C-alpha cells in the first residue's frame, strides 16, 4: 500500500496543480521612456502589496505599437497607455479635443476589439510638448507654435520615430501650423531629444509636457494655440481575462485613479532623469506617502 501511494504521489501533486490553476502572476510592461517605466513600477508594486500576486516586469519594451501588440497577444497583461495615443494611433480616429469623449471611445473600443480594459486615469495629461531653448524663445519672441512657423525655415527639428509617423504627430502638425524646416526633421529615440536640443544639435523637438528635464535644461514649451493635440490621459490598460482571473487587481488599480497631477508627474520624472534615482525606490516612496 505504501509503495502504491509513493508511486501515485507525483501524479496527485500534478493533478492538484492543474486543479488549482497556474501560479498567480501578472506581467506588467512599459514603453521605452522614463514616465512609462515609472508608472509601470508604481502599478506593479501596488498590485503586489495590495493583492499578494507576483508581478513580472518587462519594462522599456518599445513604442506604442510594440506594447499594443504585446498586450493583445498575451505577452504582457498590463501597461500604461495614453487616451489620445490610443484614439489616434491605435484606433485611427482623427484628433479631437474633448477628453471625456476620447476616454469613453477608447474604453468601449478596446473592450470590444481587443478584450482590454481601461482603468481609471492617473489624473495628469501628458501632451506632446513642442520645445525650444529658453534663449531662442526670448530672442525670437516665441510663445506659440504659430510663432515657430516664422523661424522654422532656418531651423532644424528633431522628433521621435513615432511622432514622425502618427496621425497626431508631425504630418498633421506641419499641415495645421504651416511648418517648413530647413531640412526634413531628424528621427531619433524619444529619450534623446531633450539632450539633443539642449546641446544645440537641433533647434526644436516634440517632447512630453510632463518631462522632468524641461525645467532642468531651461527649455520652453510653445503653446498649442490651434488646439491640434488631443488629450493624453495616462491610465493602466489590462487584459479583461486577467481581471476576471484576479478580481482584487481592479480594486488595487482603482486606488491610483486621480492621484497624480501634471506637476507631480513632472516631479517624479525629474527624480529619475535629473536626480538619477532608481525608479523602484521612487515608486515605493510615492506609494508609501500617497497610499499608505
Set out the residue ranges of the language-model regions.
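Alpha-to-beta junction loops
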Residues: 72-81, 152-156, 172, 197-207
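Short helix-initiation/N-cap motifs at beta->coil->alpha
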Residues: 54-69, 183-195
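Short, well-ordered beta-strand elements
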Residues: 23-36, 53-59, 153-158
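Beta->alpha turn/N-cap motifs
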Residues: 60-64, 74-87, 102-106, 133, ...
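An extracytoplasmic/periplasmic, membrane-proximal ligand-sensing/linker region
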Residues: 164, 168-169, 174-176, 247-292
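Ligand-binding "clamshell"
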Residues: 90-119, 199-202, 213-227
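Ligand-binding cleft/hinge of the Venus flytrap
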Residues: 43-51, 145-183, 285-289
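A conserved helix-loop-strand patch within extracytoplasmic ligand-binding domains
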Residues: 100-157, 240, 258-262
